């Protein structure tokens, strides 16, 4: 996975553990693709301060993932989810009974409501 | 949910964010039900030091849950999992075709392999 996308996922997952200012700067850098001088100007600070903040937060996010592995789990669960959905489609295709098809639709909805 | 069980769940979920010593003391207190003086003796320290450590870690665990809500999600996902399994049983009961039953068994296995 591309580094920038991965960092964006880490930020979505662990952003609540950072301060509002840290998240704000990280989003400008990783999601909005702004340069460090641009972010420094927006925050009325130096390029060096932004560089240090990004570096520190980067390290914190990798550390959280290293310990909790939520992004790794998320990716694994996404694969399982896709697998289940594929099987439900096959099953639905092979079943005629209307009530059973409805039950499968409900299972699919349940699968989508998992927060992973 | 009983306070002690809840704390035990928080500890299993966020223990990797604490130090080894902190987890050790918290497990003795919440899982093994030892008293503070007993834990103090085992750790060759004072009851007050253990009291402070437990209080601080308790606060940290609640803070992590307040921000990441992993235990809350876990409980919600467990309910969804149970719901899906109930529906799969109903479906299996109503289906005759052997291949379809096998497909349902596979879906059930997938559901169990979710790490939530």
Swiss-Prot record, chains A, B:
InterPro entries assigned: RNA_pol_sigma_r3/r4-like, UPF0122, UPF0122_fam_protein, WH-like_DNA-bd_sf
Signal peptide (residue range): none
Disulfide bond positions: none
Family membership noted in the UniProt record: Belongs to the UPF0122 family.
NCBIfam families in the record: PRK00118.2-2, YlxM
PANTHER family named among the record's database cross-references: UPF0122 PROTEIN CBO2450/CLC_2298, UPF0122 PROTEIN YLXM
Function: Might take part in the signal recognition particle (SRP) pathway. This is inferred from the conservation of its genetic proximity to ftsY/ffh. May be a regulatory protein.
The name this protein goes by in its record: UPF0122 protein CA_C1753
Organism field: Clostridium acetobutylicum (strain ATCC 824 / DSM 792 / JCM 1419 / IAM 19013 / LMG 5710 / NBRC 13948 / NRRL B-527 / VKM B-1787 / 2291 / W)
